[in-house]
A protein has these predicted regions:
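Amphipathic alpha-helical substructures
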Residues: 1-84, 145-159
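Sequence context surrounding c-type heme c attachment/ligation sites in exported
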Residues: 50, 67-68, 89-188
Length: 188
């Protein structure tokens, strides 16, 4: 998924935010274990988000078309209600890498530029926001924006540079494992 113009991302943005809210509602309303925030066997998505997830849905789990619903005029007039009603819990295959908060499209998108992934930003976010680890930028060091990977210089090469630099290694040893684990996903 590449969206250099940002049009598709702009259209999906409200759903990317709403996805986590709807996921939380399902866990709360169904009295599910909090462990589902870490790893769940389901996602809560709508039709536009399924363009990212690309799940093959059984007929009984087919996501509703808003126009098919009885009170469609009410729904079409209220954007927030329309978004909430269109989300559905969808069970995942056992082989799926999705499930839990960290694999949601909105969470993954937070730490990318929409064109390519950034294991450093993703790893730092998980280390700080989820695990509460302290990561301090060394004094007098500027962080450069990550350039798009090329055939001759990959993200792996950039990671190796940081790991081999003693100034960078202390933080990268904490955050890179998280960021690399999230490389199983594209920008979403």
């Amino acid at each position: 998924f590449r969206d250099r113009g940002g049009e598709k991302i702009a259209k999906l943005k409200p759903f990317l935010v709403q996805e986590s809210i709807e996921f939380f509602k399902v866990i709360l309303n169904e009295n599910l274990s909090l462990l589902n925030f870490i790893d769940s066997d389901f996602v809560v998505i709508n039709r536009p988000l399924n363009d990212i997830y690309k799940l093959e849905l059984p007929e009984e789990e087919e996501l509703p078309n808003i126009a098919d619903q009885k009170d469609s005029k009410l729904i079409l007039n209220d954007k927030k209600l329309r978004r909430q009603r269109a989300f559905r819990k969808v069970m995942l295959d056992k082989e799926s890498r999705r499930g839990g908060l960290l694999t949601q499209a909105g969470i993954l998108m937070m730490n990318t530029n929409g064109e390519f992934t950034n294991p450093f930003y993703r790893g730092a976010w998980v280390a700080q926001s989820i695990y509460g680890l302290e990561l301090e930028l060394p004094a007098n060091l500027e962080v450069e924006a990550l350039n798009a990977p090329t055939e001759t210089f990959t993200i792996k090469d950039t990671i190796n540079e940081h790991r081999n630099n003693p100034i960078c290694a202390s933080c990268h040893s904490k955050m890179d494992p998280f960021g690399l684990a999230m490389e199983n996903f594209d920008v979403f």
